[in-house]
Every structure is written in C-alpha cells, then in structure tokens.
A protein has these predicted regions:
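Short acidic-aromatic low-complexity motifs
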Residues: 2-34
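A beta-strand edge to alpha-helix "cap/lid" segment located at domain peripheries
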Residues: 3, 56, 61-123
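A solvent-exposed, acidic/Ser-Thr-rich amphipathic alpha-helical stretch
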Residues: 8, 27-81
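A broad detector of the eukaryotic-type serine/threonine protein kinase catalytic domain
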Residues: 16, 39-40, 119
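A general structural-boundary detector
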Residues: 18, 41-44, 91
Length: 123
C-alpha cells in the first residue's frame, strides 16, 4: 500500500471506527491501528495527546450523540503526508445536525496530528 493509499484509508475509516464507534474496545483497537502513540488531536474544545486522551474524548463525544452517524461530504483529498475530508453528523437518513472538516498529518502510516474544524450552525 502506498502512503497516499494509506492516508485515504485513514480518512475513510477514522470517522466511523474511532469517533462513530460506541464499543470502547473496538474504538481503542482502531486508535492503536490508526494513530501514533504521541498523536495530537486539536478540536474547538481542546487538545488531546496520546491514545488514552483520544479514546476518552471520542468516547465522551459518542455518548452525547449515540444515535448519530458520520457521513463524508465530497471526496477526501491527499497531498503528500496530509489529508482532508469534509463530513456531517446526524441521525441516519436525515440532514446532518452539524458538519466539519478533518485535516490530518500522517507519519509512518499513522495519524500523527488531527485538526477538527466545525462549521458554524445555521439557525
């Protein structure tokens, strides 16, 4: 698998298998497979460093919206060791309640840094 293919795989699987996963053991296994040990995840709510912090954050986030699903909006894009994907989250078969953009940097085939941008909600 090329570096570009691995980055596309990470973009495709991260939302579902980390942030969309309700089972703690499966989520933790995905984190260990997808993220470097010293990973940094930067969100509007804070910065999380390492597998434990990411697992706790993703689990807490999932608990607030257990019935929401993540869907990709458009095609992921990759340039060298970086990738982006736009996404939405909400109830299945309904318009997303919120949307965002993930930007990730890959090192040695794993996500080293993830930046999560949330779009302003319209009301």
């Amino acid at each position: 698998m090329t570096a570009t293919e691995r980055t596309l795989e990470l973009l495709a699987r991260n939302l579902q298998e980390v942030f969309g996963e309700g089972d703690m053991r499966r989520r933790r296994a995905a984190i260990e497979d997808f993220y470097t040990d010293d990973c940094v995840v930067v969100t509007p709510d804070g910065t999380y460093v390492g597998h434990d912090a990411l697992n706790d954050f993703a689990g807490d986030l999932r608990a607030t919206h257990p019935d929401y699903v993540y869907t990709h909006s458009g095609e992921p894009q990759v340039v060298q060791d970086a990738g982006i994907v736009a996404w939405g989250s909400g109830l299945k078969d309904e318009d997303p309640e919120y949307t965002g953009l993930d930007v990730l940097l890959v090192r040695d085939g794993k996500i080293a840094t993830l930046y999560v941008f949330l779009n302003p909600t319209l009301s």
